[in-house]
Regions:
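Cleavable N-terminal export/targeting peptides
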Residues: 1-36, 274-277
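Solvent-exposed N-terminal domain segments of exported/luminal and surface proteins
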Residues: 21-89, 100-102
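Outer-membrane pore/translocation modules
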Residues: 23, 47-56, 82-204, 212-214, ...
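Membrane-embedded beta-strand positions in outer-membrane beta-barrel channels/transporters
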Residues: 69, 73-75, 116-118, 158, ...
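Long, repeat-rich segments with strong aromatic
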Residues: 205-210, 216-242
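C-terminal membrane-adjacent module
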Residues: 232, 239-247, 251-253, 264-268
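Outer-membrane beta-barrel "beta-signal"
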Residues: 260-277
Length: 277
């Protein structure tokens, strides 16, 4: 557990340093050539998704030491090439880890750790020589490192796109072809879904962000919902106060088939561009 926390703090520091190096986000300059130049000159090691540390309680049930927790996520990416592969793509590795920590119980047990490595091809989406977003094709693995009846794992081929509507709004779509090899979670698609849509909004000064993520489950008109609000500490950093609400199934792998409704608060360090979900 100590190694996990130390790794999390180390990667947060790396992300803070990266935000100072890359002072200009792609959405601020829509010329395609300038966007490629920014990408090729930017650090190879970056944040991938949001990196956060939040704690909270269930909604609709009495909070107890067993159902209240701390959740944290670290997510990094290493770009392996410049944007000079076929179709102006670039090769990258990513690693994302989510932890669910029962800090209110005796001995502070880590309830579940979800490991999500992947390798993919990224692409800047350009229309009429204007940058309008990004996409990627990735092979992912996700598991919780447990054995016996507590083991959970699956693989998927993911296709995702994030498109800028303007400097304030972005929409995202992500779909996947699942390869379920975990004997204890053969019905995971019923709960973790088959595709995801999201919308991001942020103010002109980047001080306030709002995100809504909907993950479509297999049954008709059923979604897992995540709503996020963040407010920046100050204008010169990418650290934010963070509020996250989750409602549905599949928040963690161990309890993927158990319904959760959780409200948590803490802080988040965001990538320079809009967040990826």
């Amino acid at each position: 557990m100590k190694k996990t926390i130390v790794s999390f703090l180390f990667l947060l520091v790396c992300g803070m340093a990266h935000s100072q190096v890359l002072a200009k986000g792609p959405e601020e300059s829509y010329n395609a050539d300038s966007i490629r130049a920014i990408l090729d000159k930017s650090p190879y090691f970056t944040l991938f998704k949001d990196n956060y540390f939040i704690g909270g309680i269930p909604i609709g049930n009495k909070p107890t030491a067993r159902n209240s927790d701390v959740k944290f996520q670290l997510s990094i990416a290493q770009r392996l090439t410049k944007s000079k592969l076929p179709f102006d793509t670039y090769l990258f590795l990513q690693y994302t880890q989510k932890a669910f920590w029962n800090v209110f119980q005796e001995s502070l047990p880590m309830r579940d750790l979800n490991f999500n490595p992947g390798i993919g091809l990224g692409h800047l989406i350009v229309h009429k020589n204007k940058y309008i977003g990004k996409g990627y094709l990735m092979v992912e693995h996700e598991s919780n490192g447990k054995d016996s009846i507590f083991s959970r794992s699956w693989n998927k081929i993911t296709l995702a796109a994030a498109v800028l509507l303007n400097k304030n709004w972005e929409v995202q779509f992500k779909g996947w072809i699942p390869i379920v090899d975990g004997g204890e979670n053969k019905d995971i698609l019923k709960y973790n879904g088959i595709f995801q849509v999201a919308a991001n909004y942020r103010t002109d000064n980047r001080r306030f962000n709002c995100g809504v993520i909907l993950t479509k489950r297999k049954t008709w008109l059923s979604f897992n919902t995540q709503i996020e609000l963040s407010y920046k500490f100050n204008n010169n950093e990418n650290q934010y106060f963070f509020l996250q609400y989750y409602n549905g199934y599949g928040e963690n792998l161990l309890e993927y088939n158990q319904y959760k409704s959780m409200l948590r608060i803490g802080f988040v360090i965001k990538p320079q561009d809009f967040s990826i979900y």
